[in-house]
Design a protein with these regions (language model features):
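Hydrophobic/aromatic interaction determinants used to assemble and anchor large protein complexes
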Residues: 1-180
């Protein structure tokens, strides 16, 4: 019922070769290749893409460098610069109170701006960002601030101990709030 309320598909055949449901994308932590795939990448190194903002050819880059670029993140998430800033400022996405601020924000070009995190910390942020963004799309009448507050009120702030079942419970509670 929660998946239906949120408009998230639930695929009956999952597993190693099966399709991934929207419910799984919202509830399961993604790392490594599974995380890169949600952002449209199939490898973690030797990445060559055209920067979506500047048109510059980026070659032989590692995934953490590519996905730390604000121009790539806004393109891959569909968020505007302002929306990305708001999402990174949330406790849920950043992983701590006060959130993150984009580095080199004073630049006029998103291709020069970066998410100020590296390696495993960046991976954690990117995992929560993709789930937050997907959930935001499922709740189009909610602002980023409203979704952030609702997640916090449902106990959705994540830690090392957070399991997929905990994330499912948060989504069930969010579906209840939506129905009110």
């Amino acid at each position: 019922l929660a998946a239906e309320t949120l408009g998230a598909s639930v695929t009956q055949t999952s597993g190693s070769g099966g399709a991934i449901s929207e419910w799984e994308l919202l509830t399961e932590k993604r790392t490594g290749l599974n995380l890169w795939k949600v952002y449209g990448f199939n490898q973690s190194s030797n990445i060559s893409i055209v920067d979506p903002a500047s048109g510059e050819q980026l070659t032989d880059m590692d995934i953490d460098v590519v996905l730390a670029l604000v121009s790539v993140l806004t393109d891959r998430t569909g968020l505007s610069l302002d929306e990305l800033e708001q999402a990174l400022a949330t406790h849920f996405v950043a992983g701590f109170q006060g959130g993150l601020r984009i580095s080199q924000r004073d630049q006029c070009k998103t291709s020069k701006m970066r998410v100020p995190a590296e390696s495993s910390v960046l991976d954690e942020i990117l995992d929560r960002l993709h789930r937050f963004t997907r959930l935001l799309r499922k709740l189009p009448d909610w602002s980023i601030a409203q979704l952030s507050k609702a997640i916090a009120s449902c106990g959705g702030l994540e830690s090392e101990e957070t399991e997929n079942e905990d994330r499912e419970e948060v989504l069930i509670n969010l579906a209840i709030i939506k129905r009110l």
